Structures are given as C-alpha cells and as structure tokens.
C-alpha cells in the first residue's frame, strides 16, 4: 500500500495551527482525520479533512486501539501536551509518530537545558537563576540586575501542581525590584517549586522556523512579532514574515543548535533581537508547530507537509529546493484573541 493512501490523524485540529496542517496534507491527497476536543474545532469544517474525531480523553485510553482499527499510517500533533503523551506512547503505536521522542522533547521543554545547549554553540542566552529550596531568596534577589522576567523552566512539569494548589499558571511575569521578585516567588512556596528568573532582554521577538532531517534544515522561514497578548509578553497576535536574506547568520546558528540537539522535524527558535546592539538573545525553542504557522503557509513554507513528506515518503527535500528562500510576497498575520 502506498504510504500516502493511509490515513493520518492530526491531533489538535481545534486551532488555526492544526487547521493549517490538515490543509497542507489534505490538499496533496493525504486522507486526514482531524481530531479535536470541541465540536467547534476548526479542522472539523475543513474540506481537506476526510473525517473528524471528538475525544477529550488521555491518548493512552484510546489511541493505540484507534490506530489499529483505522489502519493509520501516522499521527501528528500540535500541542505540547499531546507531544508529551505521544512520547510516552511511541512503542505502543503501530504507526509512525511524527513528533519528538522523550529525550529530544525534554531538551526543549526544559528552558535551562535549552539555554545551556545554546551557549555551547555560541548563541547568547540571558543570565538566569533557578531558585531551589533552601536558598536565601531575599539575598539572591538583592544581587540581581533589574528588570527580570519570571517564567517556568518546564511549564508542563508544574501545571498539575499549580492546578492542585489553586494557583494560576503565568506564562511570564516581570519584576522591577527585589521586593516584587520575592513577592512573586513566595506565591509558589506551597508547592516547593519556583519559576526561572531571567535577565530582561530589550528588542523585538524574532522567530526562526526550521524543519530538520538528519542534522540539516530542509525548510526555513522567519517572522517578526509586531504585537503580543498580553503586551507584557505572551502569544503572537500580530506578526510579519521576514526575508531569509535578513538575519542569515543567525539562521545558520539556529540550525547548528537544533543539529546539536539531534532534532528531527519542525521547531521554532525564538529570539529577542536588540537592533541597538545587534544582539540575538535566545528565549526558547518551540519543538512543535507554532502559533504563526498559518503565516508560513500563506508565504509558501508548508511545514506540515514537509514533516509528513520527509518521514513518510522519503523525499529529498534539499534536492527539491525547499531549503531555499521563500519566494512568496511578504505577508502579515493577525490572530484574533
């Protein structure tokens, strides 16, 4: 049976990200089953989805049996939560799992590991402090240069504890002085775990997106963040594509970083770029399809298809020229919150 004739399950078709993956595969004749957690999932209504599956249960409760019953050729996913679940299920699924294994996923979910790897390949990383039990937080806070950003090193590892304690998850917070910092840290004393404290980096958000296969990038794209929600830092609500002729040397470093991590598949290397000093500060690596994937799609960079084709069809992406600059006109994308 031809690989392209076997159905592919796309987990997380609720969002514009998942919808984009459904479109890219379905438009090329791949039978796509769009999975969502809501009856109003966007992917459900795409003409490129062969069928829709609504299931809110943990993947371990249904995916192995479903894979067998449907004869799936592959499973793809959008959210970090699904990536974590799939990493634990890889050996139980009789199909290709087009998401990172546990070791590679851990290298990007843990920001401390990511930043250490970046320093080894010559990428600037902001100074940071990971508070641990037994430290004198007040004394350490008094030594730090402000302002600072406070974010969890591995958000998925603490969400359960935060929820059990009735503490809201904060993607990022800022402190302007020691009192503000210690007040924020004290909020988490009850769970015995504290977020990472990171040097504030001026500039604007620059995302460099790559698809990696066997140590090389087969597709590249980049965007600049114009607006975020909330404005203090969060998801990209307005962004613009950037020609690959710009920030070219940093794109090479991004590829080197992902190669050093042994990365396979799509990833976004996210920087804060300061034009005043021409400094690129690494913020994190998103080891998954990112929020502005629709922008890449409309600029002709089809990362969903690239992920599928390289893994399932064995196409030589470099030979096809998909690692070259995107020829489509530059575009901007708005995400309505």
Regions found by a protein language model. Give the residues of each.
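Active-site nucleotide/adenylate-binding loops and adjacent lid/helix of ATP-dependent enzymes
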Residues: 105-195, 214-216
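Glycine-rich phosphate/pyrophosphate-binding beta-alpha loops
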Residues: 157-158, 227-230, 235-237, 286-300
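C-terminal, active-site-flanking charged/polar segments
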Residues: 299-309
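Flexible, glycine/charged-enriched surface loops at secondary-structure junctions
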Residues: 196-197, 264-269, 317-326
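ATP-binding N-terminal substructure of ATP-dependent carboxylate-amine bond-forming enzymes
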Residues: 1-101, 135-138
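Peripheral (often C-terminal) accessory segments that flank ATP-dependent C-N-forming ligase machineries
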Residues: 309-337
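Conserved metal-phosphate-binding beta-hairpin within the catalytic cores
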Residues: 208, 259-294
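Phosphate-binding site of ATP-dependent enzymes
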Residues: 175-231, 244-252, 272-273, 280-281
């Amino acid at each position: 049976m031809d690989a392209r004739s076997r159905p592919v399950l796309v987990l997380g078709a609720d969002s514009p990200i998942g919808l984009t993956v459904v479109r890219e595969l379905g438009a090329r004749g791949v039978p796509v089953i769009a999975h969502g957690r809501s009856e109003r999932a966007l992917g459900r209504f795409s003409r490129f989805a062969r069928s829709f599956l609504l299931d809110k249960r943990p993947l371990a409760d249904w995916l192995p049996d479903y894979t067998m019953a449907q004869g799936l050729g592959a499973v793809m996913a959008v959210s970090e939560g699904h990536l974590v679940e799939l990493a634990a299920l890889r050996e139980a699924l009789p199909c290709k799992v087009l998401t990172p294994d546990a070791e590679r996923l851990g290298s990007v979910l843990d920001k401390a590991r990511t930043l250490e790897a970046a320093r080894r390949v010559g990428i600037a990383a902001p100074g940071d402090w990971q508070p641990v039990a037994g430290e004198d937080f007040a004394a350490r806070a008094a030594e730090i240069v402000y302002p600072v950003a406070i974010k969890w090193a591995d958000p998925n590892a603490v969400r359960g504890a935060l929820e059990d304690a009735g503490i809201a998850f904060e993607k990022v917070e800022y402190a302007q002085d020691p009192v503000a910092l210690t007040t924020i840290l004290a909020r988490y004393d009850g769970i015995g775990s504290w977020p990472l404290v990171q040097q504030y980096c001026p500039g604007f958000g620059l995302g460099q997106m790559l698809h990696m296969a066997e140590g090389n990038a087969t597709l590249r794209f980049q965007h600049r963040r114009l607006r975020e929600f909330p404005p203090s830092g969060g998801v990209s609500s307005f962004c613009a594509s950037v020609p690959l002729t710009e920030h070219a040397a940093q794109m090479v470093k991004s590829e080197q970083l992902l190669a050093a991590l042994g990365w396979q598949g799509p990833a976004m290397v996210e920087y804060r770029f300061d034009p005043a000093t021409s400094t690129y500060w690494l913020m994190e690596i998103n080891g998954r399809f990112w929020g502005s994937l629709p922008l890449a799609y409309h600029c002709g960079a089809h990362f969903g298809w690239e992920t599928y084709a390289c893994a399932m069809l064995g196409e030589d992406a470099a030979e096809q020229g998909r690692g070259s600059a995107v020829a489509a006109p530059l575009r901007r994308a708005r995400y309505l919150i």
